[in-house]
From Swiss-Prot:
Catalysed transformations (reactions): N(2)-formyl-N(1)-(5-phospho-beta-D-ribosyl)glycinamide + L-glutamine + ATP + H2O = 2-formamido-N(1)-(5-O-phospho-beta-D-ribosyl)acetamidine + L-glutamate + ADP + phosphate + H(+)
Pfam families: AIRS (PF00586), AIRS_C (PF02769), FGAR-AT_linker (PF18072)
PANTHER family xrefs: PHOSPHORIBOSYLFORMYLGLYCINAMIDINE SYNTHASE SUBUNIT PURL
Function summary: Part of the phosphoribosylformylglycinamidine synthase complex involved in the purines biosynthetic pathway. Catalyzes the ATP-dependent conversion of formylglycinamide ribonucleotide (FGAR) and glutamine to yield formylglycinamidine ribonucleotide (FGAM) and glutamate. The FGAM synthase complex is composed of three subunits. PurQ produces an ammonia molecule by converting glutamine to glutamate. PurL transfers the ammonia molecule to FGAR to form FGAM in an ATP-dependent manner.
InterPro entries: PRibForGlyAmidine_synth_PurL, PurL_linker, PurM-like_C_dom, PurM-like_C_sf, PurM-like_N, PurM-like_N_sf
Pathway the protein acts in: Purine metabolism; IMP biosynthesis via de novo pathway; 5-amino-1-(5-phospho-D-ribosyl)imidazole from N(2)-formyl-N(1)-(5-phospho-D-ribosyl)glycinamide: step 1/2
Protein name: Phosphoribosylformylglycinamidine synthase subunit PurL
Protein source organism: Thermoanaerobacter sp. (strain X514)
Gene Ontology biological process terms from the UniProt entry: 'de novo' IMP biosynthetic process
Sequence positions that bind Mg(2+) 1: E85, N526
Length: 733
């Protein structure tokens, strides 16, 4: 066993700590159990000391971080359950299964809480699709998500996708799931009741995914290709049966505690449940239903075979459980019992093959506060002299270039592969500011979004992360939803590098600041580190998943222009910032400058104003101004509503900056002519600048600045550029 712990990702110091916990040298199975439970993926050992700065309390919070998912009270004895998780490393190696099992895993996190999943979202990051490998990754990640979600019958209603060079070879696949549960039916993973039986339910256990959690805690390299067995294989039809069987089981009083088997499989589910409950657990591996012959204790304990759950059952109710699972054609086997000594004791063929304290696996992983320093290149990339950027001679071309850029263009090629209408509750479909899903039997709806501009976070992780939170909240407000909770997925490079740790720390502080100011608690989340390729780390990408509550679904608002002659109004102020903008990258090939600065109090006022205007029925459309600036937002609203616009701007800014600056917080709204004065009056009361800039009319976009016509383009030409870009990229050789 020469230094085998190193191969499994443990340091020599960590190995010494294990010896002192056990009072002896661990055997191979025990080393394996510690290696997965103490991996970054399971233990958050580089991020936990920072995560405590996030605000996790709020009047709606029923369950914050620490369980399988977060839970928020939405009234009427109902709660929304939400969680986002990454499946980045598996998707880089085996994109179809990596993405599919990412979806499967996050769905299990939701129904293990007792909730019925109602929606999926996906936040995706890819390299530029100009080579075969990148296209292969994109095609297969999207197909993996689509097939799993479509087969299990849960609508994929939204998400976000960005393409940047930094994600080449290390795509980000962050899957978010949301469910609804009656408040008194929430289930938790807290084992209790000495002598209560422990059952494994669902699929059989095979060799797939062994050591996947430790694999997800390393940088990708050439050798990663050899780790394909670390990627699990998903079966959405099996998961559909498991979902229905579990929800039916929850209607009985047989379940004491339940946990899905995700990363680290039987090891994590057993030690986490036992540790939360302050108890021990004895497991007999001869009773685990296996799908392969000759599996060792190490393999059974570390298998990440999908579609399995571990259940602690009330003593004497085992048959009730078996009856339910038999009906759905699934396994339910009693494999152990709860003990009072706090140990995870694993038995095979009558012999003890592993015996370790549950708490030491689940809670005692070392935590690291790393050294940090500002990256050497940071000062250089933050320099931007606007005078070096010559305004384009042809503004029509500049507009077409910006709206057909990969990050602004329509993502229809992606979301058209998803069934977003299954379950028939989707009220706002993908492609809008936020998705909206009705809650059956009520007037309520939940609005959902994921947001993060990694480029902003690369230029300034503190400000960029605040913008991610602010934009997610603004997107929800645009459809008439009040933001109620965040689930975040922090995607970064190797935290052992000082500049990466600096990015991670500043990003978390930025999220904390924005969530505190906007009063939105973080209820769940995930950290994915070591996201690097040969060139270095990905852009820091703290993806913000957010849910908002709509009390009356009949009052939702969308971004499409509704009526000719409606007046177009910009809310908020253009501060003339173009650092980190899509315009700067697309038209000049530059990723430079400071990201736009954000005043969170200003943001709060704008969001409250938009919610008020929607609630009062005073506006016909609303759309947030972000990537691509005012010009892109205008084109998107026009294309969505199949109506043009005539715009006249008065400004002291340069024409291109007026059109393409991404200064937050801003929104584009349309108002019936007779309601304009009232809207302007209310905006004044909320201290939000509001400027009439034009009207909805015709079939083209015509813009003049300070009396000079600078843009005049038919809507169909713009639509072709905007709608066709990604499809064209994916189909060209």
């Amino acid at each position: 066993m020469d230094k085998i712990w190193r191969e499994l990702g443990l340091t020599d110091e960590e190995y010494e700590k294990i010896i002192s916990i056990l009072g002896r040298e661990p055997n191979i199975t025990e080393i394996g159990m510690y290696s997965v439970m103490w991996s970054e993926h399971c233990a958050y050992k580089n991020s936990k000391p920072l995560l405590k700065y996030l605000p996790t309390k709020g009047e709606r919070v029923i369950q914050g971080p620490g369980e399988n998912a977060g839970v928020l009270d939405i009234g009427d004895n109902l709660a929304v359950v939400m969680k986002i998780e990454s499946h980045n490393h598996p998707s880089a190696i085996e994109p179809y299964q990596g993405a599919a099992t990412g979806v499967g895993g996050i769905i299990r996190d939701i129904f293990t809480m007792g909730a019925r999943p109602i929606a999926l979202l996906d936040s995706l990051r890819f390299g530029i699709p100009d080579d075969k490998r990148t296209k292969y990754l994109i095609e297969n990640v999207v197909a993996g998500i689509a097939d799993y979600g479509n087969c299990i019958g849960i609508p994929t209603v939204g998400g976000d996708t960005y393409f940047e060079e930094s994600y080449k070879g290390n795509p980000l696949v962050n899957a978010m799931c949301v469910g609804i549960v009656e408040k008194d039916k929430i289930k938790k993973g807290i084992a209790k009741g000495i002598g209560n039986p422990v059952m494994i339910v669902g699929a059989t256990t095979g060799r797939d995914g062994i050591g996947g959690a430790s694999f997800a805690s390393q940088e990708l390299s050439e050798e990663s290709e050899e780790k394909r067995p670390s990627v699990q294989v998903g079966d959405p039809f099996m998961e559909k049966l498991l979902l229905e069987a579990c929800l039916e089981l929850f209607e009985t009083d047989a379940v004491v505690a339940i946990q899905d088997m995700g990363a680290a499989g039987l090891t994590s589910s057993s030690c986490e449940m036992a540790s939360r409950g302050g108890v021990g657990m004895e497991i007999d591996l001869d009773k685990v239903p296996l799908r392969e012959k000759g599996m060792t204790p190490y393999e059974i304990m570390l298998s990440e075979s999908q579609e399995r759950m571990l259940v602690v059952v009330e003593k004497g109710k085992e048959e009730d459980v078996q009856k339910v699972f038999k009906k759905w054609g699934l396994n339910a086997a009693t494999i152990g019992k709860i003990t009072d000594d706090g140990m995870i004791r694993v038995i095979k063929e009558g012999k003890i093959v592993a015996e370790v304290p549950a708490k030491s696996l689940a809670e005692d992983a070392p935590q690291y506060i790393r050294e940090e320093e500002v990256p050497k290149w940071q000062e250089d990339v933050n320099k931007l002299n606007i005078n070096e950027v010559k305004p384009p001679e042809d503004m029509n071309k500049a507009l077409k270039d910006v709206i057909s850029s990969l990050n602004v263009a329509s993502k229809e090629w992606i979301y058209s592969q998803y069934d977003y209408m299954v379950r028939t509750d989707t009220a706002i479909t993908p492609g809008m500011d936020a998705a909206v899903v009705r809650i059956k039997g009520t007037k309520k709806a939940i609005a959902l979004t994921t947001d993060c501009n990694g480029r902003y976070c690369y230029l300034d992780p503190y400000i960029g992360s605040q913008i991610a939170v602010a934009e997610a909240a603004r997107n929800l407000c645009m459809v008439g939803a009040k933001p109620i909770g965040v689930t975040d997925c922090l995607n970064f490079g190797n935290p052992e590098k000082k500049e990466i740790y600096w990015q991670l720390k500043n990003s978390i502080f930025g999220i904390a600041k924005a969530c505190e100011t906007l009063q939105i608690p973080v209820v769940s989340g995930n950290v994915s580190l070591y996201n690097e390729n040969e060139e270095g780390a990905i852009y820091p990408t703290p993806v913000i998943g957010m849910a908002g509550l709509i009390e009356d679904v009949s009052k939702i608002c969308t971004m499409d222009f509704k009526k000719e002659r409606d007046v177009i109004i910009i809310l908020g102020e253009n501060k003339g910032e173009i650092g980190g903008s899509e315009y700067l990258k697309v038209c000049f090939g530059m990723v430079k400058g400071q990201p736009p600065q954000i005043d969170l109090e200003e943001e709060k006022r704008l969001q409250e104003l938009v919610l008020k205007l929607i609630e009062e029925g005073l506006i016909n459309s609303s759309h947030d101004i972000s990537e691509g600036g005012f010009a892109a937002a205008l084109v998107e609203s026009a294309i969505s509503g199949k109506k043009g616009a005539k715009i006249s701007l008065q400004t002291s800014l340069r024409e291109d900056v007026e059109l393409f600056s991404e200064s937050p917080p801003r929104a584009l709204i349309t108002v019936s002519p007779e309601k304009v004065e009232e809207v302007l009056k209310i905006a004044y009361e909320y201290q939000v600048p509001a400027q009439k800039v034009g009207v909805v009319e015709g079939k083209k976009i015509a813009i003049e600045v300070n009396g000079k016509k600078i843009i005049d383009l038919p809507l169909e030409v713009l639509e072709e550029s905007w709608r066709g870009r990604i499809k064209w990229e994916m189909e060209r050789n």
